[in-house]
Amino acid sequence: MKKYITSLVFLLTLCSFAFANVDHKTLAIGESAPDFSLPGIDGKTYTLQSFKNAKVLVIVFMCNHCPTSQAYEDRMVKLTSDYAAKGVSLVAINPNNPAGLRLDELGYSDLGDSFEEMKIRAKNMKFNFPYLYDGETEVTANKYGPVATPHIFIFDKDRKLRYNGRIDDMENPAKTPHSLDARNAIDAILAGKEIAVPVTKTFGCSIKWAEKSVWIDKAQIQWAKEPVKLDTLSADGIKEVLKNHTDKLRLVNLWATWCGPCVAEFSDLVTLNHTYRDRGLEFVSISADDPAKKDKALGFLQRKQASGLNYIYTGDDKYKMIEAVDPKWDGALPYTLLVEPDGKIVYAHQGAIDAEELRKIIFDDPMMGRIYKEPVAKP
């Protein structure tokens, strides 16, 4: 329960209600849809004219990293398939600028919000609608004024805005919504009726406007201030580390300052720590340097801002260290393990890591993953 509450509090700090945004004006009901020219993940460039034959045009601002946006992905796929034959077109736009996205905001996703990562998400989730990128300039987002992801705008055949706000009133896809706001709006437009509730508040992750890059600067300053220590550890101590008597997922790395691949990959490990530590990842580094070189190892860790648990092996028998870590390990550095509570090793790799592969393994672990893992409830 404590872990859930902590995750929820952190998530809410990244989220925004519609009334909280005052910097970017949201398009008003009755206004015309602003034109745009944006690249799609399919290699095409889309404009408003690309959807000229649609009786109803649905534009949803969404992204990869946001857990609320992720919770609605399947519902967007189903909405598209349910209404395609009725002349309704749906297009998704990612408004987020990478400069406004902190590492710890990526902890709820295996992918960031870059154009290339959009292609991966669309393929994995079988998107049946165009997915466009506006993050580089945010020109389109500034015209429409979404306040959160997801935020949906629905236009009639004359491209006048008839509805804007939430998709429905239930974020959790395992539960049934009480109000299918977007579907109700589409049905009303198709039937030539007025929409009962044309504007709703919008819950989700705040738009990552380029000016929010100050958040990243603040995070880097904060991380730089975190103390970095290097403690000693025996072979028996290593065994205790690997038993992992905690409620955290431990990322353990064996390294040394004289090991080129170790030095080259270390920044990636620190990045993974900053990304997932608020969700329960704990980074543990164990240096195989000569204990007499402890100051050199500590200096390296400080330059890398490695504020996790850092140890240096103090024994004079490196083979005892190897056996204490993993009898299957040949002894070559670097060596990286992912250890669940009670010592279950779910990943062990000798040599340089593939950072993106390891990120996915961390995210896919049962202790991480999407916030909502249950089957999707059908509206």
Question: Which residues fall in each region the model found?
Answer:
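Bacterial N-terminal signal peptides
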Residues: 7-16
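A short beta-strand-turn-helix
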Residues: 37-57, 229-250, 270-276, 322-324
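N-terminal, post-signal-peptide region of Sec/Tat-exported proteins
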Residues: 38-85
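Short pre-active-site segment immediately N-terminal to redox-active cysteine/selenocysteine motifs
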Residues: 55-57, 62-65, 248-250, 255-258, ...
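Conserved redox-active cysteine motifs that mediate thiol-disulfide chemistry
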Residues: 63-75, 254-271
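Thiol-based oxidoreductase modules, predominantly thioredoxin-like and allied folds used
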Residues: 87-112, 127-137, 280-294, 306-318
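Short, internal strand/loop/helix patches
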Residues: 110-149, 153-154, 162, 298-333
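Thiol-/selenol-based redox modules, centered on thioredoxin-like
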Residues: 156-230, 332-379
